[in-house]
């Protein structure tokens, strides 16, 4: 996407491979013209920059932060007690307008706490959510929440759907995103009290709500936004990651089992590399937060330089769309949608529209 923006603030001390891999990813992004400000202990960050021969001509700067949030730290307490930690300083830069967004591979709970504490929420937003981009057969469907809110109420799912619709449309360019709630079946009677109440409300929302989807639908690309509570979403995400790893290992063993299979593997190497790249979580880079007054991306704790570079790029892309400006307007009717109509229970709103295949582009 085009257009100049303020730099992306990157937590240089977040993640299992910090600061080395984080700094390398930031340098790689800067070499491609993406402005970056690295946040962390200045001497240590500059030492890493020297190792990567990051010259002064790059759009890259260092902003000091004297404290670090460790993975074992309590998120809320760390934000309050370590006021100069690298995560909080990143958000301070975003809040002041000196950064267009932030990226951290550190303590995800601390990132969420920092976002709420420093940036705040758009008017009407009950709880922010973590969004994941799924490696589907077609398109780039979103799934939320992925762990921010494990115990949800119907209002949370309704707002997740409305915020996800905005992100899909504004950031991913989907003209009319199809929204579904993850459930144990497509029938209206399936699900829980939580999902049925949310579904009844979303049928009245000004969005393309297509009802329930099942776990088998997550990677088909038939829907653009999949809504669930943070507990279920996180379990589903980790299940997909584990499945991809096991399938990859099975494939590797099969291609090495005989001479013929080894030859077949060599002949199909390009196709296999393309598939590997498609399902590689590092290509996504990070999971955006929605429901806060700023752009924030949470990267995997195991992120390497490639993942950080891609997270910086995606944070910049999101910042350019100014999607946050629309969030408050999108969630404004959410409470009214949950009110039970005078002529019947919320669950009795007629049949849910069935999904149809997306138009070919």
From Swiss-Prot:
Metabolic or biological pathway, per its Swiss-Prot or TrEMBL entry: Lipid metabolism; phospholipid metabolism
A GO molecular-function descriptor: phosphate:acyl-[acyl carrier protein] acyltransferase activity
Source organism superkingdom: Bacteria
Keywords of this entry: Cytoplasm, Lipid biosynthesis, Lipid metabolism, Phospholipid biosynthesis, Phospholipid metabolism, Transferase
SUPFAM superfamilies in UniProt: Isocitrate/Isopropylmalate dehydrogenase-like
Family: Belongs to the PlsX family.
Binding partners and assembly: Homodimer. Probably interacts with PlsY.
Function: Catalyzes the reversible formation of acyl-phosphate (acyl-PO(4)) from acyl-[acyl-carrier-protein] (acyl-ACP). This enzyme utilizes acyl-ACP as fatty acyl donor, but not acyl-CoA.
The protein's name in its UniProt record: Phosphate acyltransferase
Lineage of origin: Bacteria, Pseudomonadati, Myxococcota, Myxococcia, Myxococcales
